[in-house]
Amino acid sequence: MAEATTAENTQTGILGWVERTGNKLPDPVFIFFYLIIALVIVSIVAALSGVSAFHPTAIDEATGSALRIDAVSLLSPENIQRLWVEMPATFTHFHPLGYVLVVMLGAGVAERSGFFAAGMSKAVKSAPKALLTPVVALVAMLGNHAADAGYVVLIPLAGILFAAAGRHPLAGIAAAFAGVSGGFSANISPGQLDALLFGITEEAVGASALDPLWTANIAGNWFFISVMTFVYLPIIWYVTDKIVEPRLGPWKGGATAGAQADDMSPDPADERGALAAKGLRHAGYAALFVVALWLLMVFAPGTPLVDEAACEAVPAADCSIHTQLAPLYRSLVAAFFLLFLLTGWAYGRATGKIRSHRDLVEMMAESMKDMGYYLVLAFAAAHFVAMFGWSNLGLISAVHGAAAIQSTGLPLPLVLGLMVLFTGLLNLFVGSASAK
């Protein structure tokens, strides 16, 4: 024990500094509490100093000029009353809370029924040996919808399959880990993380008070995450096959336990064999049903997910197809909930994992147990975001921040690049997406 402690304390270099610094950071929940304390102090100083900004769009009806927004102390009687009286509403109205919990109700069933694990296993084991590395990397990236199943199932499975193909298992483990962890935010479809982040984005915009009616779309990051899937894929493939595996040397251990060098198909006696194939087939039918249902609600008469009257209340120049499709975008959280729920239920029924509705309810309840820490974090984050808005510092900082960036004369791509670099640096110390 003493040796391990000594080794940890003597780590040098940039990675050692990053690890030591990260370990010294408090829990993300307390980071938010410390930020709230700092916010209270800043709001008092700003209010006493008369800090203000002019709203970029709102007009003061009394003067006809831009509306002036003054900083408000969080220790004012109104804000103290709001803190205690509205505490339940502040927590429950936190947008990411509802979005994430709804999606996880369905994803929890898909994970606990074995659907995610079986789907990843089937995809990887069906890969030609020549394409084993890119298939492992791709399935690993897609597996971020499966939460911990990507780490628990795919990483060791990749090692077994590489050994069965006569390749070094550590190369397979490296490729799978790079896909699961390094490609965590790359996918061909939105998922739980997108539900979390677009909810936080809505809260941030709401706190700025720039546009209270603005809403985000869970598919807003889809272009980025889908493109990054195919950017990461060749990189992982090249690094694994051309850099990592040659350094490991030839594999002389033969096929590992549970795998045969000339047979990479699942054991028919295994649940992930013939029985799993039946479950995956039923899950596919369930997925087609959900897709058909959403298409029906978009194109069928009545079009409940298309607001055909949306353009009647806005000028023709401001109306677009996206305005009319707003209900469809807002329904995607429910769509992913239903997709994960029905595919997991269909798989579980076919394999015997779910024998009655009680098993289904138990899986949903278990998934909510796993969200306990997130609920605590959401409570702290919700109050920080809300208090930021109550103090008017959100709008004031947004207006003055935009003016400061504009005054530098830096081109927008460079500003965005600096933001990406800052976020990447922050990732080394704070792993939680919601905490960042």
Predicted regions and their residues:
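Intrinsically disordered, low-complexity non-transmembrane regions of multi-pass membrane transporters
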Residues: 1-24, 53-75, 245-279, 309-317
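Juxtamembrane interface elements at the cytosolic ends of transmembrane helices
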Residues: 11, 113-119, 234-268, 295-312, ...
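Interfacial loop/helix-cap signal at membrane boundaries in integral membrane proteins
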Residues: 13, 52-96, 207-217, 300-328
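Membrane-core helix-loop-helix motifs of multi-pass transport proteins
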Residues: 19, 23, 27, 155, ...
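Core transmembrane alpha-helical segments of multi-pass membrane transporters/permeases
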Residues: 28-33, 37, 41, 62-117, ...
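Hydrophobic core segments of alpha-helical transmembrane domains in multi-pass membrane transport
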Residues: 32-48, 100-108, 139-141, 179-183, ...
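Membrane-interfacial loop-to-helix junctions in multi-pass transporters
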Residues: 89-97, 124-135, 169-171, 326-334, ...
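Hydrophobic alpha-helical transmembrane segments of multi-pass integral membrane proteins
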Residues: 100-102, 128-159, 164, 375-384, ...
